Amino acid sequence: MPKSNRRDRSITYASAINEATRQLMAQDDSVFVLGIGVDDPRGIYGTTSNLSSEFGQDRVVNMPLAEDAITGIASGSSMAGMRPIVVHERMDFMLLAMNQLINVAAKSHYMYGGAVKVPMVVRSIIGRSWGQGAQHSQALHSFFMHIPGLKVIAPTTPHDAKGALVASVRDDNPVIFVEHRMLHNYKGQVPENLYEVPFGKARVLRTGGDITIVGISHAMVECIRAAKSLAAASISAEVIDPISLSPIDVQTICESVEKTGNLLIVDNGWTPCGASAEIMSLVIENVQRQDKVKMKRMGFEFVTSPTSKILEDLYYPDSRRIAKNAYDLIMGKKTDWEPDVQESPEIDEFKGPF
């Protein structure tokens, strides 16, 4: 098999993003990267490492602390024929660019009667740990799911991170590309060649017949581990990664729910008015056996993101609580069953700062 098509190698999530960016920039001169610290030696957790030395500062543009201006430059240049990749190292501070994202990027194609395209990607990094607390740990993907004209994608695996970024850069619409810091060192098999992971197509990561578990972003890793714990209790969980949140593949989820009769949605965000609420609503509207389906949602506790490790452990859903909730949902009541789940060997706590 030619080297360019190798599929058996294992690389990290961050390396997959870096590789996709490098290959796209080499293939298409209209692709460029801009953001705060994109040329830093640490390379935004390794995702932009060595890009500046390879492509120059005209295509890897370090920007000042001005999120609104950064995003405005991206939206304007995309309308002029470029394909910018904006890097916002903290999703929290994308709030400073909401006018550019919502009133300009998302609406220009419609407002100009289809004459204008806005092919820009906004890499928005979310996460937790290292005591980042209220203003540096928020997951705000649900905000952007509410806006017509924006696409939202949140890949979990290195394979899907590379393919989803390629699809996002090639798309003619603005895309919010959500990535979790604690996934950056997550390893998986990734082909060397360029390929696309399409929007609106979920991936079944584990098949099962007793319960459907849908996990978003980093929560998916915990869901897989929870499914293994449930298997030890003779419960077969089907685990689905939506990957694309807007548009979302409701058909794959509904087909699974009609088979299992139980649905647990685990969001990497707050549950009120969030992605889990949207998924549950879509299932209610589309599933054929509503009266026989039991559903439950899990997500962040509905309080401000905490700083201390003790509170973080209570705040974020983990595999133990996911398995316990899934088991009790199937049984139709609270039980005394306790899952046997070991500490995650796949994910490292983020140790900061960049």
Predicted features and spans:
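Thiamine diphosphate
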Residues: M1-P174, V178, P339-F354, ...
